[in-house]
């Protein structure tokens, strides 16, 4: 007798990461081109010496460091094996049957529909607005008696667009208090909206028990290979997250690197500013070439190429630069270092390429 596997799993698509190819420039996975901060690299080496010991299952030291950094209590912070693991755990603690609905904009983070179906819940996708941003009014209007969870990816992956604080607060005011709203801020460190409008989810959600904020050390901090992210929210939600947390899933090296990165965060601004300079240079060059490129608050830009997306991705790969096509929606291009960006522009801004794909 063969094992009885859930039949619905056969319809779940595998998560598709950005491609890798030796010798090619990889602008497909939103990774930083720089290694971890020096203090983090040192902490990684030291922590590796203790790899024969189990890590702190509660990530107590890291939670305390984050609580101090964010101005919250330790009880408001949970740690996960990357913020995507926390996304799945949030579905687990809110949804218990296929009648339960998880709302999110589309297109948005590719993992949302996957983890929703894995969690045996129903995904409800709300189309983006014409400017490739979350349609917050439509998202609020899509809430039903079955809605349990809403993911708001801000800035949005893969389109790079972001809503300011005022728009987010209006949206949150429209959502029933029993529906959990997740502000997924994986690219928070790259946002450069005005100080008055910059949507710090921790501040926005400070007096809203139904708001949880997710951030990660994978992007700006350069720890993508170590898998460590965190959630900030009401103690009741955090307690539930820690109940479904897979024991020891945040390893010792990841915890040490994250703590060291926080302690050296003053070094991060120079790195993120360099990315932003290149982001704007890349976008301006693509606009000048004739492409439609929405403003980005992330470490990538979005080319809404529609049906040409896959073909553009293959042509770029043939030119030695890997980018990330998304079906028939568009192509996401990570901001690399100046040399890598120039290689991509030599391909994309070529008049023959523009005429073919624009």
Swiss-Prot record:
<dbReference type="InterPro" id="IPR024892">
    <property type="entry name" value="ArAT"/>
</dbReference>
<dbReference type="GO" id="GO:0008793">
    <property type="term" value="F:aromatic-amino-acid transaminase activity"/>
</dbReference>
<feature type="modified residue" description="N6-(pyridoxal phosphate)lysine">
    <location>
        <position position="219"/>
    </location>
</feature>
<keyword id="KW-0663">Pyridoxal phosphate</keyword>
<protein>
    <recommendedName>
        <fullName>Aromatic amino acid aminotransferase</fullName>
        <ecNumber>2.6.1.57</ecNumber>
    </recommendedName>
</protein>
<dbReference type="InterPro" id="IPR015421">
    <property type="entry name" value="PyrdxlP-dep_Trfase_major"/>
</dbReference>
<dbReference type="InterPro" id="IPR001917">
    <property type="entry name" value="Aminotrans_II_pyridoxalP_BS"/>
</dbReference>
<dbReference type="InterPro" id="IPR004839">
    <property type="entry name" value="Aminotransferase_I/II_large"/>
</dbReference>
<dbReference type="InterPro" id="IPR050106">
    <property type="entry name" value="HistidinolP_aminotransfase"/>
</dbReference>
<dbReference type="Pfam" id="PF00155">
    <property type="entry name" value="Aminotran_1_2"/>
</dbReference>
<keyword id="KW-0808">Transferase</keyword>
<dbReference type="GO" id="GO:0030170">
    <property type="term" value="F:pyridoxal phosphate binding"/>
</dbReference>
<dbReference type="GO" id="GO:0004400">
    <property type="term" value="F:histidinol-phosphate transaminase activity"/>
</dbReference>
<comment type="subunit">
    <text>Homodimer.</text>
</comment>
<dbReference type="InterPro" id="IPR015424">
    <property type="entry name" value="PyrdxlP-dep_Trfase"/>
</dbReference>
<comment type="function">
    <text>Aminotransferase that catalyzes the conversion of aromatic amino acids and 2-oxoglutarate into corresponding aromatic oxo acids and L-glutamate.</text>
</comment>
<keyword id="KW-0032">Aminotransferase</keyword>
<dbReference type="InterPro" id="IPR005861">
    <property type="entry name" value="HisP_aminotrans"/>
</dbReference>
<dbReference type="InterPro" id="IPR015422">
    <property type="entry name" value="PyrdxlP-dep_Trfase_small"/>
</dbReference>
<dbReference type="GO" id="GO:0000105">
    <property type="term" value="P:L-histidine biosynthetic process"/>
</dbReference>
<comment type="similarity">
    <text>Belongs to the class-II pyridoxal-phosphate-dependent aminotransferase family.</text>
</comment>
């Amino acid at each position: 007798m063969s094992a009885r596997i859930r039949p619905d799993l056969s319809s779940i698509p595998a998560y598709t990461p950005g491609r890798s190819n030796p010798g090619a420039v990889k602008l497909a996975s939103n990774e930083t081109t720089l290694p971890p901060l020096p203090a983090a690299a040192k902490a990684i080496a030291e922590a590796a010496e203790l790899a024969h010991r189990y890590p702190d299952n509660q990530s107590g030291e890291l939670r305390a460091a984050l609580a101090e950094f964010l101005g919250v209590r330790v009880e408001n912070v949970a740690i996960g094996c990357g913020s995507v693991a926390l996304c799945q755990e949030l579905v687990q603690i809110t949804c218990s049957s296929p009648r339960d609905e998880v709302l999110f904009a589309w297109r948005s983070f590719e993992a949302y529909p996957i983890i929703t179906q894995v969690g045996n819940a129903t995904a409800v996708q709300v189309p983006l607005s014409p400017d490739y941003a979350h349609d917050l009014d439509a998202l609020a209007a899509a809430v039903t008696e079955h809605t349990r969870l809403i993911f708001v990816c801000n800035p949005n992956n893969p389109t790079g667009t972001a809503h300011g604080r005022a728009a987010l607060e209006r949206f949150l005011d429209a959502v029933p208090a029993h529906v959990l709203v997740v502000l997924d801020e994986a690219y928070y460190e790259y946002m450069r909206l005005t100080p008055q409008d910059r949507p710090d989810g921790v501040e926005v959600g400070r007096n809203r028990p139904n708001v949880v904020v997710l951030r990660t050390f994978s992007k700006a901090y350069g720890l993508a290979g170590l898998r460590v992210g965190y959630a900030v929210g009401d103690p009741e939600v955090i307690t539930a997250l820690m109940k479904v947390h897979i024991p020891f899933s945040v390893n010792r090296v990841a915890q040490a690197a994250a703590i060291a990165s926080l302690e050296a965060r003053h070094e991060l601004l120079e790195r993120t500013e360099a990315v932003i300079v290149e982001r704007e240079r890349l976008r301006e060059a693509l606009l000048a070439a004739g492409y439609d490129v929405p403003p980005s608050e992330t470490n990538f830009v979005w080319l809404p190429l529609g049906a040409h997306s896959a073909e553009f991705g293959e042509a770029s790969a043939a030119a030695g630069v890997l980018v990330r096509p998304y079906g028939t929606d568009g192509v996401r291009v990570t901001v690399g270092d100046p040399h890598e960006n120039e290689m991509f522009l030599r391909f994309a801004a070529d008049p023959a390429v523009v005429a073919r794909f624009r």
